[in-house]
Amino acid sequence: MDYESIDRLKQVLNCKVKKTRNDIRHELHNKAYNDSLQTEIRTLEWVLGYIVQKKVHIAKLEVIVQDKIADLKVRMDKAMHREVTDFLFTKIETLRWVLYVIHSINKGSLIVI
């Protein structure tokens, strides 16, 4: 069951990365928006890399993501520049979305649109 959950999570994250890459249109969006999308992609790829490299169980991954969010919140509280807080906020929100997906997979209620 756990391998199925991890495989499902990887599938959802890969789909989100692909969709986000397709959303980047340099002609249509401003630089700040594209930077935000790039940060989202890098964060999702970090989670995917962690899954593949460490071969963690989904419960362990949930704890790791929660710890990373807590660490980023501390860093955001100490940040002195708007660019840094925007960057950290995007990472935190992306990781919160990953937690939502993990919880949905664990409950068996994941709906992908």
Task: Indicate where each model-derived feature is located.
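Alpha-helical rod/repeat scaffolding segments in eukaryotic adaptors/tethers
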Residues: H26-N34, K54, I58, K78-T85
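Charged low-complexity stretches with an acidic bias
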Residues: K60-L99
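Short amphipathic alpha-helical heptad-repeat segments
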Residues: D2-R21, L37-E40, K54-K73
